[in-house]
Amino acid sequence: METRYAHHPEDMKTYTTHQLRKEFLVESLFEAGKVNLTYTHVDRMIFGGVTPTEQELTIQLDKQLGVSFFLERRELGIINIGGAGTVTLDGEEFLMDKRDGLYVGKGTKEVWFHSKDPSNPAKYYINSTPAHHTYPTVKIDIQNIDPIATGDPSTLNERKIYQYVHPNICESCQLQMGLTMLAPGSVWNTMPCHTHERRMEVYLYFDMNEDTRAFHFMGKPDETRHLILKNEEAVISPSWSIHTGTATSNYTFIWGMCGENITYDDMDHVKMEELR
């Protein structure tokens, strides 16, 4: 597990492209047979990819977190973006087809990840945050989610928002997690943009062709910067930063949030004329 530290917005003004990518971009999440995680000190979110092939995989971070087992003091959200598989929680097995999700409550001792077909492995994207209470584990089938349709082709942002770990679906301590799918011909997400000083966010961009690139904009509204991402890369967005993007083709992204509240629409909107 890699550790990333928090940054003051004034510091980011001096960053080169290389420094910006080193601090906020995570490039290698899904590697066959591996668990690749990043621990950001921004609200202590842990996120990353678990890609089992022939062997099951689990997350062992007891020494790094100073606990007896990974979810002793944490909750966990999982969305599978790869082939079919199963997740086993303390002996109970959950089938995970592509884009299925799972909320795992604090106190779950054993979490095992499995792929049905090693040649088409499951790709489990995870978000984990500190938790103070145990809420029930909930399996979230994408077929059972009623997406929010928003945007418009005229503004290149027609999309559907699927809420997974969200008060409309299940209870959680502070974690929120969902998936946004852009329609063909649409490329903009979260524009007009916003910040939310009360919560941080992590974006995972995926379902992109090999030569498709996403342009993720971040920074204070009057001091914006950008990162260029390829398929299955993620970016850390501190609470003071905007988080919006466009791409050379349509794409899908997973958003994960944590912080002071779980109010999805608690945001500070930024007027277009305020962007620099």
PLM feature spans:
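A short beta-strand-loop-beta hairpin characteristic of the jelly-roll/cupin
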Residues: F70-K98, F206-N231
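Conserved metal-binding segment of the jelly-roll/cupin
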Residues: M96-K116, I228-S249, G256-C258
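Hydrophobic, proline/glycine-rich low-complexity stretches
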Residues: M1-D62, G66-L71, E75-L76, L275
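Acidic, low-complexity central loop/insert segments
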Residues: G82-P121, Y125-P130
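Double-stranded beta-helix
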Residues: P118-G178, A183, V202-L227, I254-R276
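A short glycine-rich, His/Asp/Glu-containing loop-to-beta-strand
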Residues: A32-L65, E158-E201
